[in-house]
Amino acid sequence: MVDESNAGPVAPAVVADAEVKAPTGKKRSSSRPQKAPPEPAQPKMPAAKRRGYSEQERSEKLRLIETKVSEGNTLKDAIKSAGISEQTYYHWKGAAKSAAREDIERTRPLSAGDEFAELVQLEEENQRLRKQLAEKLRTENTELRKRLGLD
């Protein structure tokens, strides 16, 4: 069975006064599918609250760790048994060391030259304070005289 409608040669179609438009600009692609709305965030577990230790608690834990290490435990095990992290241990140890160094510097005896310089400084401060007190007493005295009508 032959289809007779397609059997002959095809004549070109001529369209008069038709303008051929050249493509201009970018071709638009088909619209993209919309993004799915973000899933609601799962409620996060609250982070563990930081525990603040007092100076006394810190020094007790450091002493506890030192005694456990001297008994033969490893440093890591001693720190774990104290309930703090290694980082916290080293931070506390450094702070305690610097505080001890400051105490030593404060209690160090002064040399003769330092003692003399400190004495001169104290005498200057004493003179300044005496002048300040005298001026304050003078102004207070004049105000009292005015109130009493003695001036």
UniProtKB/Swiss-Prot annotation:
In which residue ranges is the amino acid composition biased (Basic and acidic residues)?
A: 52-65
Q: Does the keyword Transcription regulation apply?
A: yes
Provide this UniProt record's keywords sorted from A to Z.
Nodulation, Plasmid, Repressor, Transcription, Transcription regulation
Q: Where is this region: Disordered?
A: 1-65
The domain of life for this entry's organism is Bacteria
Entries under Pfam families matching the protein? HTH_Tnp_1 (PF01527)
List GO molecular-function terms, semicolon-separated.
DNA binding; transposase activity
* Ranges of biased composition (kind: Low complexity): 7-23
This protein's record includes keyword Transcription = yes
Q: Name one GO biological process term.
A: DNA transposition
**Family indicated by similarity:** Belongs to the SyrB family.
Please state what the protein is called: Probable transcriptional regulator syrB3
